[in-house]
Amino acid sequence: MTTSCSSQVRQNYHQDSEAAINRQINLELYASYVYLSMSYYFDRDDVALKNFAKYFLHQSHGGRGHAEKLMKLQTQRGARIFLQDIMKPERDDWENGLTAMEFALHVVKNVYQSLLELHKLATDKNDPHLCDFIETHYLHEQVKAIKELGDHITNLHRMGAPEYGMAEYLFDKHTLGSSES
């Protein structure tokens, strides 16, 4: 049974913000889905780059966590969550680590741009709580992710990827593998 009663706790939470948060939830879930696809591509026996697989699985969990945090915000603010279909990743075969990292950078930049637009909307609607939430939980983390992916792409290029197959193996082992605890 669904109910469409108005919320008792909703205060200073514009409908446009509610709708934008629902779109952001979908975008975060899409990013998680893309990273999950990448993770299991690199985990295949004919690709066998386990640290690429672990790296993208970690990113997938992060994207899902971001979506869940936004869902929690919606319920705390008295809004309603309206989930949408999650778009399928644009490809199933990621070809190589460089291609995957470049696409991941594209995804994270899209997520960041969407967060900036959400922050502007919150500012325009005079919602300091939403502005603070986005600043505290998302913006800095996205900037760090963009820098990290950019560094990985630079290093893969520098090592000769994708033409030099050993580059991905060495990057997987020494760069992504060095973050293991």
Swiss-Prot record:
Identify residues that carry N-acetylmethionine. Answer: M1
Q: Name one Pfam family in it.
A: Ferritin
Keyword set, alphabetical order: Acetylation, Cytoplasm, Cytoplasmic vesicle, Host-virus interaction, Iron, Iron storage, Lysosome, Metal-binding, Oxidoreductase, Phosphoprotein
Ranges where the Ferritin-like diiron domain occurs: 11-160
Which Gene3D superfamilies does the UniProt entry name for this protein?
1.20.1260.10
Give one GO molecular function term. Answer: ferrous iron binding
Any Gene Ontology CC annotation:
lysosome
The Phosphoserine modification is found at S179
Reaction catalysed? 4 Fe(2+) + O2 + 4 H(+) = 4 Fe(3+) + 2 H2O
Q: Which GO terms describe its biological process?
A: intracellular iron ion homeostasis; iron ion transport; negative regulation of ferroptosis
Where found?
Answer: Cytoplasm; Lysosome; Cytoplasmic vesicle, Autophagosome
Give the Enzyme Commission number. Answer: 1.16.3.1
Would I find Phosphoprotein among this entry's keywords? Answer: yes
Record-listed N-acetylthreonine modification sites: T2
* Top-level enzyme category: oxidoreductase
What role is this protein assigned? Stores iron in a soluble, non-toxic, readily available form. Important for iron homeostasis. Has ferroxidase activity. Iron is taken up in the ferrous form and deposited as ferric hydroxides after oxidation. Also plays a role in delivery of iron to cells. Mediates iron uptake in capsule cells of the developing kidney. Delivery to lysosomes is mediated by the cargo receptor NCOA4 for autophagic degradation and release of iron. (Microbial infection) Is unable to assume its function upon interaction with viral proteins, thereby increasing Fe concentration in the cytoplasm. This would inhibit the accumulation of reactive oxygen in host cells, leading to reduced apoptosis and increasing the survival of virus infected cell.
Subunit details: Oligomer of 24 subunits. There are two types of subunits: L (light) chain and H (heavy) chain. The major chain can be light or heavy, depending on the species and tissue type. The functional molecule forms a roughly spherical shell with a diameter of 12 nm and contains a central cavity into which the insoluble mineral iron core is deposited. Interacts with NCOA4; NCOA4 promotes targeting of the iron-binding ferritin complex to autolysosomes following starvation or iron depletion. (Microbial infection) Interacts with classical swine fever virus protein NS4B.
Q: Which family does the entry's similarity section mention?
A: Belongs to the ferritin family.
Q: Protein name, please?
A: Ferritin heavy chain
From which source organism is this entry? Sus scrofa (Pig)
Q: Taxonomic lineage per UniProt?
A: Eukaryota, Metazoa, Chordata, Craniata, Vertebrata
